[in-house]
């Protein structure tokens, strides 16, 4: 009887183990699109050139899906703070999937929002998420123009330049 119970328990354990391994084996790999370096460079350069054409010296940062810097360019004649600001704007837009300037309104609605304590967080306008459909694959931030709305206009020009490749 003891052997029968032991054998039954071993068979049950084997069945459970085989089922679990079968589930793991049938798991799917994640499939997603990421920004290439060449697209990120085009976005950053176009944003900087657009602002320059309007008389503004800016820096630009493009971050990828995980908030990592893909390209960061300090524009000619920009202040040293523009590199950090452009990154914070891009990181915020990527993290929340919204224009960085919208964070100010969200923070006013919820002053206890934990996001304000994140390293790299800002409420400054001047960054937009980069999307393929509804999937946020990165973001670009610009800093240096006199006003976040001007930074954001340059960002939009950069994204628009590669819009046909974001599919």
Mark where each language-model region is:
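N-terminal secretory signal peptides that target proteins for export/translocation
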Residues: 1-7
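Bacterial N-terminal signal peptides
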Residues: 9-24
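Flexible, solvent-exposed loop/hinge segments and secondary-structure transition points
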Residues: 25-167
């Amino acid at each position: 009887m003891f052997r029968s119970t032991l054998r039954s328990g071993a068979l049950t354990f084997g069945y459970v183990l085989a089922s679990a391994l079968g589930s793991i084996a049938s798991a799917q790999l994640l499939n997603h699109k990421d920004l290439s370096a060449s697209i990120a460079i085009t976005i950053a350069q176009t944003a900087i050139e657009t602002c320059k054409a309007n008389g503004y010296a800016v820096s630009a940062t493009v971050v990828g899906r995980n908030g990592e810097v893909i390209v960061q360019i300090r524009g000619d004649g920009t202040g040293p703070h523009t590199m950090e600001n452009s990154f914070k704007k891009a990181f915020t837009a990527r993290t929340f999937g919204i224009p960085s300037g919208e964070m100010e309104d969200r923070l006013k609605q919820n002053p206890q929002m934990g996001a304000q304590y994140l390293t790299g967080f800002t409420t400054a306008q001047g960054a937009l998420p980069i999307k393929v459909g509804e999937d946020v694959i990165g973001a670009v931030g610009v800093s240096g123009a006199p006003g976040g709305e001007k930074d954001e206009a340059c960002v939009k020009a950069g994204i628009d330049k590669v819009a046909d490749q974001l599919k």
